[in-house]
Amino acid sequence: VFSSAATENLESGAVNLEVAKGDRIKVRDCLYGLMLKSANEVANGLAEHVSGSVPSFAKKMNRRAQELGCTNTNFVNPSGLNNAKHLSTPHDMALIAKACFDRADFRAIDRTVSYHFPATQKRPNGTDIVMGHRMISSGNADYYPGILGGKTGYTSAAGNTLVTCAERN
């Protein structure tokens, strides 16, 4: 069940799927909403579901990042939205991405081009979401053969970000 903290504490202009307090959405659907749409309230809701709160989840993220060998990463929230203490490096993000891409369940979600996100209070018919990573879709001019997946991002502080994994030969 989504809380008001998960759904209402987003910075202006943050990408979301209009999930509201009290909405019930399966974890699997949330993962698609997170990876395809970058829905920030969904990231917060998943964090609360897993750890009870966003700060507790951020602590788990930081522990896992250290286990993966990250040395210049500090997470403050699960969405990546602006926070002066939230930081990482390309090298550390590559380590995290590798761990993600090693999982078949992650790759299956991350390679999905479109998905029907289920009904919510504000969208009773659900909504179709489309992967924002243009290199994944073979019908896009930016398509990259051999791509396994990736994640786009944007914040006003960081600008456009991208981590991608591909295999060739």
Which residues are covered by each model-predicted region?
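Short, glycine/proline-biased beta-turn/loop segments that scaffold the active-site neighborhood
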Residues: 1-16, 111-118
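A mature extracytoplasmic/lumenal domain signature
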Residues: 2-6, 21-23, 31, 48-50, ...
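Conserved catalytic neighborhood of penicillin-recognizing serine enzymes
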Residues: 8-43, 126-149
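Small-residue (primarily alanine) positions within well-ordered alpha-helices
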Residues: 42-43, 47, 65
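Penicillin-recognizing serine hydrolase domain
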Residues: 52-169
